[in-house]
Design a protein with these regions (language model features):
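Amphipathic alpha-helical interaction segments
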Residues: 53, 67, 80-83, 107
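Short amphipathic alpha-helical "recognition" segments used for binding
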Residues: 7, 68-70, 94
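N-terminal helix-turn-helix DNA-binding core of bacterial DNA-binding proteins
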Residues: 29-65, 87-99
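Conserved acidic functional residues
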Residues: 36, 72, 105
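Amphipathic alpha-helical dimerization/coiled-coil segments
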Residues: 2-30, 44-49, 86, 96-119
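Canonical helix-turn-helix DNA-binding module
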Residues: 58-81
Length: 119
């Protein structure tokens, strides 16, 4: 598994959208957000397929309405799993790896290593 590390914040990046602080992260809220298969896939792909920059929801190539994706990304942000920044009309996201590891050691590695059950 590749090394999972925090994405550096570029100079001049906009402030993050509202999110819970590290000490406000609750395990049941984080696990609730990750219990949706699409959200789990979003987080896993952000962890494993990312480069050193934030990604828009279009990067994933999901065949879903934009309103549906917006809902899922908002749920992940409000649970404290991802951080989003507004760049013009785009919202770009990355996983809050450092914050999640500080609060729930080992959780990020579990999500990264997860494989769906065979159907």
């Amino acid at each position: 598994m590749p090394e999972i590390r925090e994405i550096p914040v570029p100079d001049g990046a906009p402030a993050p959208l509202p999110e819970p602080g590290v000490d406000e992260l609750r395990l049941e809220t984080v696990l609730g957000a990750l219990s949706d298969p699409l959200r789990l896939e979003i987080v896993q792909r952000l962890l494993l397929e990312r480069e050193d920059f934030d990604h828009t929801c279009g990067w994933f190539g999901f065949d879903r309405p934009k309103s549906s994706l917006t809902h899922h990304f908002r749920a992940l942000r409000e649970a404290g799993v991802i951080r989003q920044r507004q760049y013009g009309l785009e919202r770009r996201s990355h996983v809050r790896t450092g914050d999640l590891e500080a609060r729930f050691p080992g959780l990020v590695a579990l999500v990264a290593a997860w494989t769906p059950p065979a159907d």
